[in-house]
Amino acid sequence: MSEEDRNVFTSIDKKGGGSKQMDDLNQKCPKRKTSKLKGIPKLEDANDAGTKNSQQCTLILTEGDSAKTLAVSGLSVVGRDKYGVFPFRRKLLNVCDLNVNQIADSAEVNAIIKILGLQYTKKYETEDDFKTLRYGKLLIMANHDSDGSQFKGLLLNFFHRFWPALFKRDFVEDFITPIAKATEGKEEVSFYSLPEYSEWRMNTDNWKSYTIKYYNGLGTLTSKEAKKCFSDMVRHRIRFKYNGADDDKAVNMAFSKKKIEARTDYLMKLMQDKNQRKQQGLAEECLYNKETRFVTLKDFFNYEIVCSWNLHSIPCLVDGLKPGQRKVLFACFKRANKREVKVAQLAGAVAEISAYHHGEQSLMGTIVNLAQDYVGSHNINLLLPIGQFGTRLQGGKDSASARSIFAQLSQVTRTLFPAHDDNVLRFLYEENQRIEPEWYCPIIPMVLVNGAQGTGTGWSTNIPNYNPRELVKNIKRLIAGEPQKALAPWYKNFRGKIIQIDPSRFACYGEVSVLDDNTIEITELPIKQWTQDYKEKVLEGLMESSDKKSPVIVDYKEYHTDTTVKFVVKLSPGKLRELERGQDLHQVFKLQAVINTTCMVLFDAAGWLRTYTSPEAITQEFYDSRQEKYVQRKEYLLGVLQAQSKRLTNQARFILATINNKIVLENKKKTAIVDVLIKMKFDADPVKKWKEDQKLKELRESGEIELDEDDLAAVAVEEGEDISSAAKAVETKLSDYDYLVGLALIKLSEEEKNKLIKESEEKMAEVRVLEKKTWQDLWITDLDNFMSELTSRRLARKLSLRRTATRWYAMICQRRVTWSSMKESISIRTMTVWSVRMSSRS
């Protein structure tokens, strides 16, 4: 253990301000061991806790109330004498860099200390100290997701920070439950990690005969399954084994702010190792398998914390999406019904279509986020919000329940993610099911359009929004071989100013104007400053008077809407002149903020975490990935058109041969007809064959091994393996000629033959046109289509504003409303349109 950790209390004293504060912290600890506790809601205390048998007792600490219900079901098996249960309902603090007051104010941390009987002044290195505890074990029960891993990680960090000696006594344990189960008849096989399940599938020939069930969380298990887990505690209780300095280093590396640089280097090495295993076709390493009885702290943080936190927190450069967002987009593209759907129902569809194995609550939040369009959220929302999806009043937190709002794929989304590209993406496979791609490839870098925020382990990312029109111009410059122009952050409908301070910093200003000697009007706030927060934290604070000084403001009135900001602020007499002499109004009223571009971290196309220095650098790397996809798209489309032309030509030949009685269909077996077709050199269905070839290519590239028997045989032919399987693969399928023999009698005519020949020639003409096009031409066409759709949306918005202005104008003319009430109710943009309209009529 490092010197820093040995002297933990010294460092805490320095942060807290002295031994007095340390004494205050110790006041939160129990004075003596007691068998009965009061005042801790939802605690199911073990009957023997705090008694002479306390060392045999285990406290089950659960992640939330649903997990507590599962644990209580298990108590019917193990009994209540030696087991207690307590649900932890909030996120535990990272105690590495907190001061004493922050730790002392955590009610749930204090509850854990009281339940266990811990004291900050004891190290629990001796048997006498250990016997003062109310429980001899702490058993953590959390979900199999990134939140569950974080919950466990923060708990381990907490105990390691204050009582590292407890790990030497195997005090902390992990209760694991199956993440998946395979059932066939009475046989059940449980899996505690997805890599373990994948390995079983590879080694089990008849795995398809099993029924597979995934457990999205602890709440998914039934009471019967919970009791079964508790009946085999040896299998399900995993010790956190202390392994010396390596474990100390791993914990500090994961949580200490002083280890940021070292943590970054360490995590980079771990990711390199993981990617190398993937490239070599090796199975993914996992923490839990059927042989696991203990894990070291180092292994836990390497496998559970490092990859999951970063993967789910930081988006990919190519599509700007995190895994959950990508699954939502995949499901929206795949759904046959493109009409609006309830968010809760869409979350269920996403879980089914994309093999999502965690709780649907987070999916609903992801869907809501993708549809939000208030100022400071998205420049282009990929989903249409139909209902209350949140506003700038509370930064989206005021969205309605997912059961009562609807979402729909935005029309502009498909112009950003063209359907033709779906054929050249690298899709992932799970349970022999094709799910979302490793990344989509939009026509402009969406990570810059909508920005990104996220905090992982060792990295955090914060990318501002940029103007999609300017990004289109930069892409066209790159296509033309010209240098990019520097970009400044831009947010849709933001009426303030964004001014560059230096290459990596921009000042963001709200809008404030003086109405008279004692009144100002605030009509815009800095980006990410929400209206409700501003009122509570800034304006209400300025209304408070300080020593011998009058308050800055005496009153304010609110006239904002869900989309606009409007505070009319009354200042104390003479305050305006005083402020103007000393400070800028933007500074006094906190109407300025800084936008940094120094923390732009993303996964690149190869899955590596990288730091980017500018939006132009991101655009350049995106450009390289996108260019490759256009080349692949052209190749794919040429293959499709050529196969379709060949198919039409074969059908025309077939009709002609039938008309000329060279092929007789009446009273003949299908096998005999197919034999004749083969002798006459008719092709097996060219389109079907081409699609099968593309499918096999995709499956091989994805590493998916669970193909149909015929597909495996086809692969064997190409790779020279297993001659018996290869022989089966080349055996002609009768169905390959259905496109000929299945033609309706009415189509066996001269007119139909001529029609097919014409269609074939048209396909070949399309081939010739496409062959002449370059990847640059394809890209520019997509960009122009996108800009056309974007312009249509803007015109529709203007039309909506004009209609609103017209309604107000009519109401004023009819004297149903007054000018002053209109000014208080409508947005500045609508008022401007109304003023123009009124001027044109005067």
From Swiss-Prot:
Pfam families: DNA_topoisoIV, TOPRIM_C
Residues of the Topo IIA-type catalytic domain: 314-783
Single GO cellular component term: nucleus
GO molecular function terms noted in the UniProt entry: ATP binding; DNA binding; DNA topoisomerase type II (double strand cut, ATP-hydrolyzing) activity
Mutagenesis or variant effect for E304G: In av59; no effect on viability observed at 15, 24 and 25 degrees Celsius
Null allele phenotype: RNAi-mediated knockdown leads to impaired removal of the cohesin component scc-1 from kinetochores on mitotic metaphase chromosomes.
Consequence the record notes for mutating E304G: In mr127; temperature sensitive mutant
Keyword tags: Cell cycle, Cell division, DNA-binding, Mitosis
GO BP: any one term: sister chromatid segregation
Basic and acidic residues bias: start-end ranges: 1-26
Region (Disordered): 1-50
Family label: Belongs to the type II topoisomerase family.
Function field: Plays a role in the removal of cohesin from kinetochores on mitotic chromosomes and is required for centromere resolution.
Protein name: DNA topoisomerase-like protein cin-4
Source organism per UniProt: Caenorhabditis elegans
Gene name of the encoded protein: cin-4
